[in-house]
Design a protein with these regions (language model features):
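A general structural signal for well-ordered alpha-helical segments in protein cores
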Residues: 9, 69, 78-81, 111, ...
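Glycine-rich phosphate-binding loop at the start of an alpha helix
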Residues: 6, 10, 33, 66, ...
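C-terminal long alpha-helix characteristic of the crotonase
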Residues: 46-51, 93, 99-143, 156, ...
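Terminal low-complexity tails and localization/encapsulation signals of metabolic enzymes
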Residues: 163-175
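Short alpha-helical scaffolding segments that buttress acidic/His motifs in well-ordered protein cores
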Residues: 84-85, 129-132, 149, 165
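An acidic, glycine-rich surface segment that forms the CoA-thioester-binding/catalytic face
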Residues: 1-28, 68-70, 151
Length: 175
């Protein structure tokens, strides 16, 4: 994996986020890393009581893309996003609900019911609203962030983080 992985991933996440219809995430159990990124791409998130959320990128020596960090901050709040990313904190289902990251506490049936309800609404109204909401979240990538992102993805720390994860040991990062 390298930065081309992130480029492809970001393309997938942006495609999901900009689909012309509402998207719903039904979350049960772990919603970590890539799962969290997929949930961030969805419009509405429904979670069971046993769901938990996190982006443990620092444990692997990598940086998630700016798109993810931006959506995380806008959906969780800047303080909670910083706590999650900068300490690898895992949030419970109740935390996610309290912070507004999840909109409904329920199961797959609850998510399917919301999706069904949305099909009764005017498609162009939904599309216009979704485009407007997505514009609130749009910002240009900053060169400073891009440089930090490239340094992390090209670092020995990333290799060490992945190796330590595979070997089930604590990583030794050198920065």
């Amino acid at each position: 994996e390298d930065q081309s992985f992130d480029t492809r991933l970001r393309g997938v996440l942006e495609r999901i986020a900009t689909l012309p219809v509402p998207t719903f995430a039904a979350i049960s159990g772990a919603c970590m890393g890539l799962g969290m990124q997929l949930a961030l791409a969805c419009d509405i998130r429904v979670a069971t009581d046993d769901a938990y959320f996190g982006i443990p990128a620092g444990k692997l020596g990598l940086v998630v893309n700016h798109w993810t960090l931006q959506r995380l901050a806008l959906n969780l709040g800047f303080g909670a996003a910083r706590l999650m990313v900068l300490t690898a904190e895992t949030f419970t289902s109740d935390d996610a609900w309290r912070l507004g990251f999840t909109q409904v506490q329920g199961d797959l049936d609850a998510a399917l019911e919301l999706a069904r309800r949305s099909t009764d609404l005017a498609p162009l109204s939904l599309l216009g609203s979704k485009v407007g909401l997505n514009l609130v979240e749009r910002a240009l990538d900053e060169p400073e962030f891009n440089a930090a992102f490239e340094r992390a993805w090209n670092s020995a720390d990333l290799t060490e983080g992945r190796l330590a994860f595979a070997e089930r040991r604590s990583p030794v990062f050198k920065g």
